[in-house]
Amino acid sequence: MLTLKRIQQCKLLNTIHTTYNTSLVFDIIDMARTRTYIAGEWDGDLNAIDQLYRWNEGDKWNMHFTDAHKNGQCYDTSMPCTIKASLSERLGRSKTFILVVGNNTNTTRKGACSYQNCDNKQFNYFTGQFSCKVIGKSYSTESFIDYECRLAYNAWLRNEMKIVVLYNAASVNRSKCPEKLRNVGTHVEMKSYNYNWQEYRYDYQKVKKAIEG
């Protein structure tokens, strides 16, 4: 016959067991939703971004890439503030932020809002300025890359984001990196000299170590 004390002990053990399993389930779900976000100057560094995809699709990695620039038509036809809202949502599901840096990364202005023929602007009578209904602030001069870097940096400050900066070159030149990420995260060149091919080629092991390390 179970005593009152024994019944209480059983209830306590069952509570601990249930709590542990619930926590474990949530940990597994969180891991399953991990994303790796790729940003870069699509026009100039397509070769480097494509190389990351080839490595991942070749079963070398097991990452869920979120490439904000994959749908080029969306970038050409949608309003910048609408796109930035989508970028913010995608970044919110990501644990790792990869920025591919090339010659034009720090100077491109694609994505800077101009509020020309935009249906998402509204006049704020308190400030006397137009503001964006999507991102909730006034005129934005940030490019898409600047916007992504700022969000990634803020997430990094909260210990929610790992930042990896990959240079589409054989050396690291931080002056080409947007200032927001210039001194944070891991900075690695993507290319090394291959003596067999007698040329600079993308270095899988070096990039893998930077992303997974």
PLM regions: where:
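Short, glycine/charged-enriched secondary-structure capping and boundary segments
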Residues: 51-54, 112-115, 178-181
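Conserved TIR/SEFIR loop-to-helix hotspot centered on a Trp-containing motif
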Residues: 105-155
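Beta-hairpin (beta-strand-turn-beta-strand) motif
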Residues: 102-104, 168-169
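C-terminal interaction surface of TIR/SEFIR-family domains
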Residues: 26-30, 35, 167-213
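Short catalytic/ligand-binding loop motif for oxyanion handling, primarily in non-cytosolic enzymes
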Residues: 45-48, 106-110, 171-178
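Conserved N-terminal substructure of TIR/SEFIR domains
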Residues: 2-4, 10-97, 101, 208-213
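A short helix->loop->beta-strand "cap" motif at the edges of active sites that frequently abuts
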Residues: 155-163
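Hydrophobic/aromatic beta-strand patches that form the interior of the parallel beta-sheet core
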Residues: 98, 162-166
